UniProtKB/Swiss-Prot annotation:
GO terms for cellular component: nucleus. It is found in: Nucleus. Residues 622-631, 783-800, 807-817 have a biased composition (Pro residues). Keywords: Coiled coil, Nucleus, Phosphoprotein. Residues 1-315, 380-417, 521-1127 are annotated as: Disordered. Residues 144-156, 167-176, 203-214, 233-245, 290-306 have a biased composition (Acidic residues). It comes from Danio rerio. This is Zinc finger CCCH domain-containing protein 18. Residues 1-13, 677-740, 847-875, 882-903, 914-925, 1083-1098, 1107-1119 have a biased composition (Low complexity). The modification Phosphoserine is found at S666, S1056. The gene is zc3h18. PANTHER family: ZINC FINGER CCCH DOMAIN-CONTAINING PROTEIN 18. It comes from the Eukaryota. Residues 53-73, 82-96, 190-202, 261-289, 530-615, 632-646, 818-833, 933-964, 1012-1029 have a biased composition (Basic and acidic residues). Residues 388-397 have a biased composition (Gly residues).
Length: 1148
């Protein structure tokens, strides 16, 4: 430290400076190059002091000279006397004994001359000095006072120095150099102990050395002795100590000579008295640690001593000026207490251009001025001298840093002053930039947060922005334009609670015009009143805050709106789910109670009305999803194209088609009920089947709904199979005729037992012939069938369908599967004719029905009856098909025909969805419902519902049935031979399909792939179904529909999880039945049962019946293949539509 501390070494490299150079070094290293220019060096500081002599209170010229030489020694600008003294005393002593001599001299000076102590203290920048400075609360004046006190108390030499200034000056010059060295050491120690005193000496390290004379020379030597060990750190410590002792003696002698001591005496005495104890303790520390700095300080002090420019006045004025170099560095960091040794790496950041870094005795505003707040009393020179005394303004922790005129930014950097400094006036440019940034940020936030931002920005943003831009007009704009903004905000919410309003209110207060805002006058208007500039700033702040509040309010409003929207969406979803659940529950209840709930769902009714409006277009539209899926049916394609748009209204579909299908008095109601049940399970029984199907339908899609209506029709038809028969509603007529009306049921028994499976086949082909319907028959049909007789549940239910279907079918006239087949052909034909009559538009259904019949002709004894039902159901809609499957088991032909009529669109659209959803809905309702309605009613209900809504769907369903037959052809061919005209063969296939039923999911995929497999499955199942005559209906439905859809479930889970899922659900079987009906009616009913089934499902199955009959017997294989292809396409389309709808419908 001694070497770096030597004044000659003061211009040391940053490394040396980092080593903890004395204040002189700190000043000199930066100062020697730059401070020489800036007067940073001690010599320059002294020169500055000389210039400052008037500033400092008129330091004697000798003092100024001393300061100049001391300061100039470092920058090599020392006067001749200073050079001489520095050369012989300082240079020799400094280089050799700087550390020890300075420590000793500082101790002596502390004893001898407080001036020297004070001056030296600021000059010796010790790394510890900052801490000392922090410790010192003294302002430069205080330091001077302390020096004066110390001088008075410690030495009368100060007075003597005042007496003999001229004579003592010469001696003092020499001694002051030594004293400065000592002071540097003392200041280092004092800075450690008393940062205040050293800070008072900030002007020059020599001045800082003045602190050394805190104690009498006796005390100083004592301290020097302990300091000597510290000085001993340097090899020259002993010599320095000796020289320091000599210098102390000289200084004792010279102190009376020091004229500046008079000025310094009062301050220095006070400083010395204060610093006496501190310096004693710190002298040892500083001597040990800051010997080098002390040497520099001593040199500086000696330089100052020559002229004895170290006046308390100088110190006062010099309260550490801000380091010009640091400020040049332009980077004021708040690293504060970072060690100086980091400075090299952080020179750019911490030291700016000042290489001294933390050690610099001048204030580095953010770095080394911490703790100087109290020390520097914000002397007027500092704050006023923003640039020159800026360093002093910082009141850097190092009192050694003399108040340099260069440290202009001191005010900002003074930690205590910073508040005044922080509010530096913002240039218009800066303000504009800031405002633009704020506006941009706010606008961005608003855009993001406020839903109505586009609307609001015109009204709100302008007011806010104008305020900031035109501050002159603040009052008026705040009163006027901003008021508008506020009012707008107020409309949104209570911004007044926010501080912005208060600020604005304050601004208005100042303006004298305030809006009556709640919080306006409360917050902080008063502080702003005094200073309008400040008020403007606060106003700006308040405005910004208010704007932020407005933004927050807007954001909140946007969020609330979004939340409300989300809530509404969730509510809609919940309502859909609830409707679906209601439909399911109602279907279940209806199944259990056997009473159709026509208006269970309120929304479904509304939606039904809407759907009726849209369904008329949508039944085709509903079909279109399937239509596209089933390119074979161009009508379906057309309707499918519409459906994508109408997908949104899953409920609408079933509504309008059902009303159409339900020309009968009850069908409109049933349709509506079915629509609600489709959308929300309107029918009590049918509504329950429908409800489940509708729950799937509603959640699944409009097809789902159609399906659910169809299923609801099944439950409803179980209540009012009469409805389905006379209603001519496709699903209803089937369902009602078989279930409600004994004769339709009789027809349906034939049709159902036969058509149950044929519809299953009819639906099955679209669905997966064997796969889905059998499970449906087993699962859904058991449920559906159970209402007439539970035996119709899995496997057996097909026969119970004949038998159990007989309960529904027996309702008409209980017919054995065989009779059903015979009857089914007529009934199917009649039903198909009726369907054609009612659903002539659904030619597809007719084709579908015939195809279904033909494809299931083998197992189509039921398949025929069911085939008409299925053709109606199928042409009605795949959904109807899938729903019909379950309802088909009970109301095979009527249900399938109604289902095909109504489900033409919905079934096509929901073919997959419906088969899973509808069959699930019909199934789950059927399970409960079977007991009530034996399932035919239910199945019929769904089928009829499907048939009814399908009236619009019928064209599609007929097309689909045509397609289905093409999809079923192989199945129908295989099924037809086996159960084509034989109710039992048909029943056996359903027997098999019940197992296959289980996999309803296979509705679509299986349909494509499994229609052939379904044929084989049907063949397998047909035998098994044949084995089970009662089950055949169900199995038929399971099997033939499986060919289309039902098989999906049993053997074709791949068909579609939808089928499977309905499979899990009771309604599934109904779609299976509907599906079976369609395929079966074409295969089995094309021969004779097709007509019977058609007649049984007369309203829905007329077209299907004829189609089934024609396509079933004669062109079954060929038509079945072409229709199978069509059905496969339709199934694909339906699956796609279902997938789309599921994606769209959250509930599903």
């Amino acid at each position: 430290m001694d070497t770096p501390e030597s004044p000659t070494q003061s211009p040391q490299s940053p490394e040396e400076e980092e080593k903890g150079l004395s204040d002189n070094e700190l000043l000199e290293s930066p100062e020697s190059p730059a401070e020489a220019d800036k007067g940073v060096s001690d010599s320059e500081l002294l020169n500055d002091d000389e210039n400052e002599v008037p500033e400092h209170g008129g330091d004697s010229d000798s003092e100024d000279r001393d300061r100049q030489p001391a300061g100039r020694e470092d920058p090599e600008e020392l006067s001749d006397v200073e050079d001489y003294k520095l050369d012989r005393e300082e240079r020799e002593d400094i280089h050799q004994q700087e550390g020890a001599l300075r420590v000793q001299e500082i101790a002596q000076k502390a004893i001898k001359s407080p001036e020297e102590e004070i001056l030296e203290t600021p000059r010796s920048p010790d790394p510890v000095s900052p801490a000392a400075e922090h410790e010192r609360p003294f302002t430069p004046a205080e330091e001077e006072r302390g020096d004066d006190d110390e001088e008075e108390e410690e030495d009368e030499t100060t007075t003597k120095s005042g007496l003999g200034q001229a004579e003592l000056e010469e001696e003092e010059d020499e001694e002051e150099e030594r004293r400065r060295r000592r002071r540097a050491a003392m200041v280092v120690s004092d800075l450690k102990d008393e940062s205040s005193v050293s800070r008072d000496l900030d002007e020059h390290e020599l001045d800082y050395d003045e602190e050394v004379p805190e104690e009498p020379s006796a005390a100083a030597p004592e301290e020097d002795e302990p300091e000597k060990p510290a000085v001993g750190e340097d090899g020259e410590d002993e010599e320095e100590e000796d020289e320091e002792e000599e210098k102390r003696r000289k200084r004792k002698e010279r102190k009376p000579i020091l004229p500046p001591d008079n000025r310094d005496t009062p301050l220095r005495k006070s400083e010395d008295s204060r610093e006496g104890g501190r310096r004693d303790s710190f002298r040892d520390k500083k001597k040990e640690e800051d010997d080098g700095e002390i040497d520099e300080g001593e040199i500086d002090d000696d330089d100052l001593e020559e002229g004895e420019v170290k006046d308390p006045m100088d110190r006062k004025i010099r309260p550490r000026p801000i380091c010009r170099f640091f400020m040049k560095g332009s980077f004021v960091t708040m690293y504060g207490n970072v060690k100086f040794f980091f400075f090299k790496s952080y020179l750019v950041f911490l030291t700016g251009n000042c290489t001294w870094g933390m050690i610099c005795r001048f204030i580095h505003p953010g770095v080394n001025d911490k703790g100087n707040y109290s020390l520097i009393s914000k002397p007027d020179p500092f704050s006023p001298n923003g640039a020159p005394p800026g360093g002093a303004a910082g009141g850097g922790p190092h009192p050694l840093m003399p108040a340099n005129p260069w440290g202009a930014p001191a005010v900002e950097e003074l930690p205590p002053p910073p508040p005044p400094l922080d509010p530096p006036v913002e240039s218009a440019w800066e303000r504009g930039l800031r405002h633009a940034k704020e506006v941009l940020k706010k606008a961005t936030i608003r855009k993001e947060q406020e839903p109505d931002f586009e609307e609001k920005r015109f009204t709100v943003t302008i007011g806010e922005d104008d305020r900031d831009f035109d501050k002159e007009n603040d009052f008026f704009r705040e009163r006027g334009g901003y008021r508008i903004t506020r009012e707008i905000r107020d409309a949104g919410s209570d911004p007044y609670g926010d501080p912005y309003y208060d600020y604005e209110m304050e601004a208005f207060w100042r303006g004298g015009q305030y809006e009556n805002f709640r919080v306006q006058y409360t917050e902080t208007p008063l502080p702003y009143y005094p200073d309008r500039e400040r008020e403007r700033d606060p106003r700006e702040r308040h405005r910004e805050r208010e704007r932020e509040r407005e933004r927050d309010h807007r954001e909140r409003e946007r969020r609330q709106r979004e939340r409300e929207r989300e809530r509404e969406r969730e509510r809609e979803k919940d309502s859909r789910r609830r409707k679906d659940e209601w439909d399911r529950d109602r279907l279940k209840r209806d199944e259990k109670e056997g009473r159709p709930r026509e208006r269970p769902l309120r929304e479904p009714r509304e939606k039904k009305d809407e759907k009726e409006k849209t369904l008329k277009p949508r039944s085709p539209t509903n079909m279109p999803p399937r239509g596209p899926m089933e390119p074979p049916t161009k009508k379906d394609m057309l309707s499918v194209t519409k459906r994508p748009d109408e997908w949104n209204d899953p409920w609408c579909r079933s509504k309008s088609p059902r009303r159409r299908p339900g020309f009968m008095g009850s069908p409109p109601r049933g349709r509506r009920r079915h629509r609600p049940s489709g959308s929300s399970v309107s029918l009590s029984n049918s509504s329950r089947s429908s409800s489940r199907s509708s729950s799937f339908t509603g959640s699944g899609s409009s097809r789902s709904r159609s399906r659910s209506r169809s299923s609801s029709m099944s439950s409803y038809s179980s209540h009012s199979s009469q409805h389905s028969s006379f209603s001519g509603s496709r699903s209803r007529s089937g369902s009602f005729s078989s279930s409600p009306s004994p004769s339709p049921s009789a027809q349906r028994n034939a049709n159902k037992n036969k058509a149950e499976q044929p519809p299953a086949a009819a639906k099955g082909p679209p669905l997966k012939p064997g796969a889905l319907p059998p499970p449906r028959r087993d699962k859904g049909p058991p449920k559906v069938m159970p209402s007439p007789s539970l035996p119709e549940q899995p496997g057996k239910p097909p026969k119970p369908i004949t038998e159990t279907v007989k309960p529904p079918n027996p309702r008409p006239p209980g017919r054995p599967p065989g009779p059903r087949e015979p009857r089914e052909p007529p009934n199917m034909r009649e039903g198909r004719k009726k369907e054609r009559q009612q659903h002539n538009p659904p030619r597809r259904r007719t084709v579908s029905g015939s195809v279904s019949g033909s494809s299931y002709s083998g197992s189509s004894s039921r398949s025929r009856s069911r085939s008409s039902s299925a053709s109606a159901s199928r042409s009605g809609s795949h959904k109807s098909r899938s729903l019909s499957v379950s309802s088909v088991s009970s109301v095979s032909s009527a249900s399938s025909s109604s289902s095909s009529v109504r489900s033409a669109d919905s079934d096509d659209m929901y073919a997959d969805l419906a088969s899973p959803v509808s069959s699930a809905s019909s199934r789950s309702p059927t399970p409960g419902h079977p007991r009530k309605d034996r399932g035919p009613p239910r199945e019929r209900g769904p089928n009829k519902e499907r048939g009814k809504p399908p009236k619009k769907d019928e064209p599609f369903k007929d097309e689909r049935k045509r397609v289905d037959p093409s999809g079923l052809p192989s199945k129908a061919s295989s099924d037809m031979p086996r159960s084509g005209n034989r109710g039992h063969p048909m029943h056996p296939p359903p027997m098999g399909p019940p197992g296959g039923y289980g996999s309803h999911k296979d509705i679509k995929l299986t349909l494509l792939n499994k229609q052939q497999t379904d044929r084989s499955n049907r063949k397998r199942y047909f035998p098994s179904d044949k084995e089970r005559p009662p089950s055949p209906l169900r199995k038929r439905m399971a099997m033939s529909p499986d060919g289309g859809r039902d098989r999906r479930m049993p053997g074709r889970p791949p068909m579609s999880p939808r089928m499977e899922r309905p499979k899990g659900q009771g309604p599934r079987p109904m779609p299976s039945q509907g599906e079976r009906k369609r395929p079966l009616s074409p295969p089995a009913k094309s021969s004779g049962k097709g007509p019977a089934a058609a007649s049984a499902a007369k309203p829905p199955a007329p077209g299907a019946g004829s189609g089934s009959a024609s396509g079933s017997a004669p062109g079954k294989p060929s038509s079945t293949l072409s229709r199978r292809e069509e059905l496969l396409k339709q199934l694909k389309a339906v699956e796609d539509a279902i997938a789309r709808k599921r994606a769209k419908i959250p509930g599903k």
